[in-house]
């Protein structure tokens, strides 16, 4: 007898309605809720999924390598990276006739192709790849790695090769392994690749499988390393006249501290990058020997955290705390076990760190690009900034989601009595109300300033605008070396201690050249009143998103309205039998509502980055400076003017190479708008609609020959909200992604 889906939940499998299908899909990855799941089995299944996850990433990379080698123009681009447009892949069947076929036959191709805006060409070129053959070899190597990963995932599900629960919970061993092996060795291995392959290639010296054992990466070999003369590796760096990829102006240094960027490639010096990675690798390997594992020496997390409490004789705060709260606190008692026994807590921390890193990458690629010539490919820069910022917001929302699930499923009040977690829960009203106050202050003041400026400009008196200079941010820029503001502080003052110390460092250094370059090159662009206002607008969005997420997590166990909320789970429905008036207070609902704010916030942040850079790249900073101080300036001079190019991708006079982006822009709007239908209409609407359709179906000839076993039941409100927020997010991303790429490409290619 065939088992009905889902096999992991007999309760759901026996549900006679369509709820069986949707709830089955919703809980497919919620391993904890599956029938017969033990803690050990849970860890083992998750461990195996890591191998699958890595395999998917590997297949993606291999697919990119293969398709660019097959259908791209990598070798032509390598010969002239500043003038040849990189091709992502061919378009096999361009619809809609000869017009679009001609429009998309671009970048020197003989057939319709897509232009590559992912930066992959720049990455592969920078790390030393030069030919299609090398791309094919890379794809094959990664495919072999993927096969090993898939085998490893399968193997670790077999009875003899399943790790034990104790192995998973040995936090010290895991930390040592992650620090020393995963971060330490891989950083040093990457330094090895840069020193042995990428840096020689950047100097016109090919290094491949045929000669990598015979080509010395440095004229003196390992002698300086073993004699302690490490400074030799920093001597004779590439000159400012170095032509990237050739020996012209090339030096011999492999580990430098030059600062700034390579004048021709616009990217960080490769020798600086190799120095960065070897330093991180060494620190990580030292860090990977800190925790007690095999030899009974080193730290344990439990001792560290238990020592951080005001009962401990060595705690410096014990007296002060007693005076303030009237009793001894147990700051970190129980925290180690709480984290070590909660996968949701660990995942929340990991997502928060990775989300922050993704946002950092977005900024880093614009301010300090590491790939050769990517700084001059403006469309790619804009696309990658947008891409990484959107990734960051979803990871951060996920961090708080799993924090909330931790409080519902894993938090033990007894084990955490009077420690820092318990205190956060006890003082949540103060935390939430303060955040609320900050949001209102930011929102009312920022909007009021914008609206005031809009009104006075509309009445023809722009001189009456309230324009606030961001003096604190300018102070930070000046402290880092920007001299245009006339603030003589730290590096902006040639006689300050940091400036004198920097001047005393041996060799040449180029940080000051970069920070004081023209706006389209400088990593610290000049800022003024428009930046001040949009900064506070973005701060409003960030604080409101944080407020919704933090409130959702801290109220996940219970609130004044619903003290026993934890008993209802993470995403309780509010449209079935049960408690009324609780529709917006599950922890899931907070994530759902925060996603809208997160999308709004990241749109504002990306609008800001994109418009300011468009102005800088076009040599017209005045447009941004004058128009960004009022809302109509943003609507008219950024959104409307840049949308016009995309909307022109389809018109009565024919089509152009922006047409695919134009259709994506339109389709994205439609998907986005569809979301509102699900967000506004609640369960009764869908149930009536479904019953009407069922009635019509059962009374229509031919159609009524097809029946179903599951009784059609409408979406719950939670499900409708999920469908709604998914359409909203996907539509938002498609619309803005198409906007960023098309509006930038129409100006710069």
UniProtKB/Swiss-Prot annotation:
Q: Which UniProt keywords apply?
A: 4Fe-4S, Chlorophyll, Chromophore, Electron transport, Iron, Iron-sulfur, Magnesium, Membrane, Metal-binding, Oxidoreductase, Photosynthesis, Photosystem I, Thylakoid, Transmembrane, Transmembrane helix, Transport
User: What's the subunit arrangement here?
Assistant: The PsaA/B heterodimer binds the P700 chlorophyll special pair and subsequent electron acceptors. PSI consists of a core antenna complex that captures photons, and an electron transfer chain that converts photonic excitation into a charge separation. The cyanobacterial PSI reaction center is composed of one copy each of PsaA,B,C,D,E,F,I,J,K,L,M and X, and forms trimeric complexes.
What organism does this protein naturally occur in? Prochlorococcus marinus (strain MIT 9313)
EC assignment: the record states 1.97.1.12
Name of the protein: Photosystem I P700 chlorophyll a apoprotein A2
**Molecular function GO labels:** 4 iron, 4 sulfur cluster binding; chlorophyll binding; electron transfer activity; magnesium ion binding; oxidoreductase activity
| Subcellular location(s) per record | Cellular thylakoid membrane
Residues crossing the lipid bilayer are 46-69, 135-158, 175-199, 273-291, 343-366, 382-408, 430-452, 532-550, 590-611, 658-680, 722-742
Broad class of where this protein is predominantly found = membrane
Q: Does the keyword Glycosyltransferase apply?
A: no
Q: Which reaction does it catalyse?
A: reduced [plastocyanin] + hnu + oxidized [2Fe-2S]-[ferredoxin] = oxidized [plastocyanin] + reduced [2Fe-2S]-[ferredoxin]
What's its membrane topology?
Answer: Multi-pass membrane protein
